[in-house]
């Protein structure tokens, strides 16, 4: 019987399947940060329960950490979350990369850097973008705080089995189109509910040809398509990325793991519940115009009008988004000015992203009135970028070079938009208020963000660079 990769991982981790109710899966790895863990630890304490397997957990501080140096945190709630995580991890013997640790950074960037997740694993984290780790052929779920507590106590997760959605992206990407553009183009077609009830497997030449960093970007955005998780079959790129890393298997264990990992890709002829095909050459650099990742067009496109939508709900959503974003139907995206440019986040905070942006910035200076901040996703990313001289390129162009953290992806750490400010952001969500009260967010790739900082507005980098 042929199986999809999702079915193989599911079957290997199924602990119990009741006649009614949710099946129970074994969890190999549990990732933690300071925002969704305090209540879970408190729940364990109230029930006099411990953590079942501390070696399965890796923790970091990322959401609330300041990026303008590691000064004292001014927000008392954020400071309390940071302090509480340090106390909880010390009490339970959990490996924590705190703000002073040389490995500190965003959880979904730190974890792959150390080879903590492997193909075929089930991984959980109290964070929506846990789907990032699907780039390694890992079934990775974002979970709620009560589930964080349950996983800590039992190393299991109650989970309904999802349907399977295969998204093929065949062919070769056009110049300056990236994994971020693939993700946004997919969401633009399927909508943010298109993947609801599914686990997505991304496949096709364009996906196979992505770097591991690009694959992480693509899987990171699977949740924005409504999917429970995103997966990419492990291959030689995956194995090369993991080999020699701190938590990767060694010696005979590596050989055994490698043999198992090679069995994970979906069998030829495996049956998916749904299949969607894309042509890579049709995917241009993307930019969102509205307040949802699905409200996205090619950079050379025209902002739609409510009358362009047959669905009355989407038409109303368009009307609302145009009003909030202060742009007009029929407007060219290349005529939209930006105030702030943000490079970073668990979507685009890796070394590849900083290289792409730096390539655009060489010998140029940001436009008058534009603020641009570069926030590496981890200290290892920051150190690598500085070793390559990328920090100097950013600084010479007028950008700010910050310390690692989630930063302006969400308004929780001092990095945020003020009312009415418009950003070009490499993060993953453009909801109302996501980057600050009444802030206006446009999602783009790193190269697109860098170009916008120079021009002062969005540009079609295929012609501009």
From Swiss-Prot:
Question: Which SUPFAM superfamilies does this entry report, sorted A to Z?
Answer: Aconitase iron-sulfur domain
- Specify one Pfam family: Aconitase
User: Looking at the keywords, is Transport present?
Assistant: no
Q: Binding of [4Fe-4S] cluster: at which residues? A: 346, 406, 409
Q: Name one GO biological process term.
A: L-leucine biosynthetic process
Q: How is the cofactor bound?
A: Binds 1 [4Fe-4S] cluster per subunit.
Q: What is the lineage of its organism?
A: Bacteria, Pseudomonadati, Pseudomonadota, Gammaproteobacteria, Alteromonadales
Q: Report the GO molecular function annotations.
A: 3-isopropylmalate dehydratase activity; 4 iron, 4 sulfur cluster binding; metal ion binding
Alphabetical list of InterPro entries matching this protein: 3-IsopropMal_deHydase_lsu (IPR004430), Acnase/IPM_dHydase_lsu_aba_1/3 (IPR015931), Acoase/IPM_deHydtase_lsu_aba (IPR001030), Aconitase_4Fe-4S_BS (IPR018136), Aconitase_4Fe-4S_dom (IPR036008), IPM_dehydratase_rel_enz (IPR050067), IPMI_cat (IPR033941)
Subunit composition?
Answer: Heterodimer of LeuC and LeuD.
This protein's record includes keyword Mitochondrion: no
User: Could you say which cofactors this protein requires?
Assistant: [4Fe-4S] cluster
| Biological function | Catalyzes the isomerization between 2-isopropylmalate and 3-isopropylmalate, via the formation of 2-isopropylmaleate.
Q: Supply the alphabetized keyword list.
A: 4Fe-4S, Amino-acid biosynthesis, Branched-chain amino acid biosynthesis, Iron, Iron-sulfur, Leucine biosynthesis, Lyase, Metal-binding
Catalyses: (2R,3S)-3-isopropylmalate = (2S)-2-isopropylmalate
The text of the family note is:
Belongs to the aconitase/IPM isomerase family. LeuC type 1 subfamily.
Instruction: State which Enzyme Commission number(s) the record gives.
Output: 4.2.1.33
Know the name of this protein? Answer: 3-isopropylmalate dehydratase large subunit
């Amino acid at each position: 019987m042929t199986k999809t990769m999702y079915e193989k991982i599911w079957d290997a981790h199924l602990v119990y399947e009741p006649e009614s109710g949710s099946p129970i899966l074994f969890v190999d790895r549990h990732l933690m940060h300071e925002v969704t863990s305090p209540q879970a630890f408190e729940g364990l304490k109230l029930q006099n329960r411990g953590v079942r397997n501390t070696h399965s957990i890796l923790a970091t501080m990322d959401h609330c950490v300041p990026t303008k140096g590691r000064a004292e945190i001014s927000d008392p709630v954020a400071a309390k979350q940071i302090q509480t995580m340090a106390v909880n991890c010390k009490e339970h013997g959990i490996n924590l990369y705190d703000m002073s640790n040389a490995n500190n950074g965003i959880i979904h960037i730190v974890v792959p850097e150390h080879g903590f997740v492997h193909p075929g694993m089930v991984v959980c984290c109290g964070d929506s973008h846990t789907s990032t780790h699907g780039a390694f052929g890992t079934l990775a779920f974002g979970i709620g705080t009560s589930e964080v507590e349950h996983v800590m106590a039992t190393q299991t997760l109650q989970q309904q089995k999802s349907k399977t959605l295969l998204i093929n992206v065949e062919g070769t990407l056009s110049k300056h189109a990236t994994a971020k553009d693939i993700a946004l183009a997919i969401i633009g077609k399927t909508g943010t509910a298109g993947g609801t009830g599914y686990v997505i497997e991304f496949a096709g030449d364009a996906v196979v040809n992505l770097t591991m960093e690009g694959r992480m970007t693509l899987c990171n955005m699977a949740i924005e398509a409504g999917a429970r998780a995103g997966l990419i079959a492990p291959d030689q790129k995956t194995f090369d990325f993991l080999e020699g890393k701190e938590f990767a298997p060694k010696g005979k264990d590596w050989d055994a793991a490698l043999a198992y990992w090679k069995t994970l890709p979906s069998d030829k002829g495996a049956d998916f519940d749904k299949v969607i095909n894309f042509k890579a050459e049709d995917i241009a650099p993307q930019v969102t115009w509205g307040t949802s990742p699905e409200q996205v067009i090619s950079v050379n496109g025209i902002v739609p009008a409510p009358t362009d939508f047959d669905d009355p709900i989407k038409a109303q959503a368009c009307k609302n988004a145009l009003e909030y974003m202060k742009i007009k139907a029929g407007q060219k995206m290349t005529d939209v000015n930006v105030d702030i440019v943000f490079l970073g986040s668990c979507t685009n905070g890796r070394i590849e992203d900083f290289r792409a942006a730096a390539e655009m910035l060489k010998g140029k200076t940001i436009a008058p009135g534009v603020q641009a901040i570069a926030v590496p996703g981890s200290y290892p990313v920051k150190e690598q970028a500085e070793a390559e001289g990328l920090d100097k390129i950013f600084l010479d162009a007028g950008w700010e070079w910050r310390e690692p953290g989630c930063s302006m992806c969400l308004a929780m750490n001092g990095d945020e938009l003020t009312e009415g400010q418009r950003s070009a952001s490499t993060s993953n969500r453009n909801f109302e208020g996501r980057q600050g009260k009444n802030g206006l967010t446009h999602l783009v790739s790193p190269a697109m963000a860098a170009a916008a900082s120079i021009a002062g507005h969005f540009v079609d980098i295929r012609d501009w660079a």
